[in-house]
Swiss-Prot record:
Its cofactor is Mg(2+). Keywords: Cell cycle, Cell division, Cell inner membrane, Cell membrane, Cell shape, Cell wall biogenesis/degradation, Magnesium, Membrane, Metal-binding, Peptidoglycan synthesis, Transferase, Transmembrane, Transmembrane helix. It catalyses: UDP-N-acetyl-alpha-D-muramoyl-L-alanyl-gamma-D-glutamyl-meso-2,6-diaminopimeloyl-D-alanyl-D-alanine + di-trans,octa-cis-undecaprenyl phosphate = di-trans,octa-cis-undecaprenyl diphospho-N-acetyl-alpha-D-muramoyl-L-alanyl-D-glutamyl-meso-2,6-diaminopimeloyl-D-alanyl-D-alanine + UMP. The keyword Transferase applies. InterPro entries: Glycosyl_transferase_4, PNAcMuramoyl-5peptid_Trfase, PNAcMuramoyl-5peptid_Trfase_CS. NCBIfam families: mraY. The keyword Chloroplast does not apply. It comes from Alcanivorax borkumensis (strain ATCC 700651 / DSM 11573 / NCIMB 13689 / SK2). Catalyzes the initial step of the lipid cycle reactions in the biosynthesis of the cell wall peptidoglycan: transfers peptidoglycan precursor phospho-MurNAc-pentapeptide from UDP-MurNAc-pentapeptide onto the lipid carrier undecaprenyl phosphate, yielding undecaprenyl-pyrophosphoryl-MurNAc-pentapeptide, known as lipid I. This is Phospho-N-acetylmuramoyl-pentapeptide-transferase.
Amino acid sequence: MLLWLAEYLAQYHSGFLVVQYITLRGILSVLTALFIAFWVGPIMIRMLQEKQVGQAIRDDGPKSHLSKAGTPTMGGALILVAIVISTLLWGDLENRFVWITLGVLFVFGAVGWVDDWRKVVEKNPRGLPARWKYLWLSVGALGAGCALFFTAQSPVETQLIVPFFKSVAINMGWFYIVLTYFVINGTSNAVNLTDGLDGLAIMPTVLVGGALGIFAYAGGHAEFATYLQIPYVAGAGELVIISAALCGAGLGFLWFNAYPAQVFMGDVGALSLGAVLGVMAVIVRQEIVLFIMGGVFVMETVSVMLQVGSFKLTGRRIFRMAPIHHHFELKGWPEPKIIVRFWIITVILVLVGLATLKIR
């Protein structure tokens, strides 16, 4: 929005042309989202407390969690508001990737909102029925896949890129839509599973989102993409604005979500943020790198799959409790130690992912 205004004002003063630079708009985007989160956060927390929108705690979970009962949830809406406002202010609203990503954010956020509302306001422990939940999540993921597939402007936009190797790309054809579906839905649910401790999910989300912004900046610049031998996707650079907004909003939310948390993200935040990571990775053709950088999300998801599979096949559990962060809690690890160690793992994995820019 402000980009249009700057372009108009540039005819009166050339200094306004500086707003065209993605780097400047990225910085302004992160600061705007951070400011909104700091400003709106206390207001939203107070409103949630007044309306008694508090988190219900499982009786069979770690006993240390019982003290968290009643902590306001659905705070992820704060992140979404900050991301959307910042993106609309500083993004190029004629860019298709901006609208596709915001569309995914809206659909997954809406599903998460309804699920949270039914659980904490209507006191329905089942939340949104699973069949309806996954129907609408599938609609959002498949819709994004179709939109990206049918608006692709070059063959590379629908190829699967293998990191660490030069010119290794697999033509996906129509299977690209299926891949997009699994990447978006898989990442969404993985982040949701990770969101079980104070600040555990949001910091890895910020780190991975920021790294994807670097890939978007490089991949959206023809010269950088050629030099680094990564896919050039025209227009992908605008994802830097969304990535920056995600980082700013996420850090602002972490201010209130850090241990001991004043507010929880809820499904409205976890499902939507995971989906945004997925769609950004698809757009910049870095799905495999997302799998590497989001290793904590993968570990949490695999731990649940192994736990369920083992119990059904043998009647025995591999972990004391799944997802795996609860396993460490029941082993006696303090919650802050688990959180920080998972953050450290994410930093390492993000650096490995960024190394693929040069190691080919």
